[in-house]
């Protein structure tokens, strides 16, 4: 399952929509909730990012992300 993780690069400042970034993770999970938990843990263990939101991408949404050219899987 591919998850899109929205985050701020620092926890020192309050989140601002203009500085929100995203990364994509391929997570082996039994269901959506398990995938969100694993994605959050993976990001928090490997970065200092402030995770805002984690979303499971549908096939259509994933195709759109690939078409826009911003899609790149992140590996830790």
From Swiss-Prot:
Enzyme category, top tier: transferase
InterPro entries the UniProt entry points to: RpoY
An annotated Gene Ontology molecular function: DNA-directed RNA polymerase activity
Gene3D superfamilies: RNAP, epsilon subunit-like (3.10.20.730)
Catalytic activity entry: RNA(n) + a ribonucleoside 5'-triphosphate = RNA(n+1) + diphosphate
Keywords in alphabetical order: DNA-directed RNA polymerase, Nucleotidyltransferase, Transcription, Transferase
Record Pfam families: RpoY
EC number: 2.7.7.6
Protein's UniProt keywords contain Transferase: yes
GO terms of biological process kind: DNA-templated transcription
GO cellular component: DNA-directed RNA polymerase complex
Family the UniProt entry places it in: Belongs to the RNA polymerase subunit epsilon family.
Protein purpose: A non-essential component of RNA polymerase (RNAP).
Quaternary assembly: RNAP is composed of a core of 2 alpha, a beta and a beta' subunit. The core is associated with a delta subunit, and at least one of epsilon or omega. When a sigma factor is associated with the core the holoenzyme is formed, which can initiate transcription.
Protein name: DNA-directed RNA polymerase subunit epsilon
Organism phylogeny: Bacteria, Bacillati, Bacillota, Bacilli, Lactobacillales
Protein encoded by which gene: rpoY
């Amino acid at each position: 399952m591919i998850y899109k993780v929205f985050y701020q690069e620092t926890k020192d400042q309050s989140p601002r929509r203009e500085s929100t970034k995203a990364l994509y993770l391929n997570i082996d999970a039994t269901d959506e909730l398990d995938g969100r938990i694993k994605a959050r843990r993976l990001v928090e263990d490997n970065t200092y990012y402030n995770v805002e939101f984690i979303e499971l991408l549908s096939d259509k949404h994933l195709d759109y992300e690939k078409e826009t050219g911003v899609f790149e899987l992140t590996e830790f």
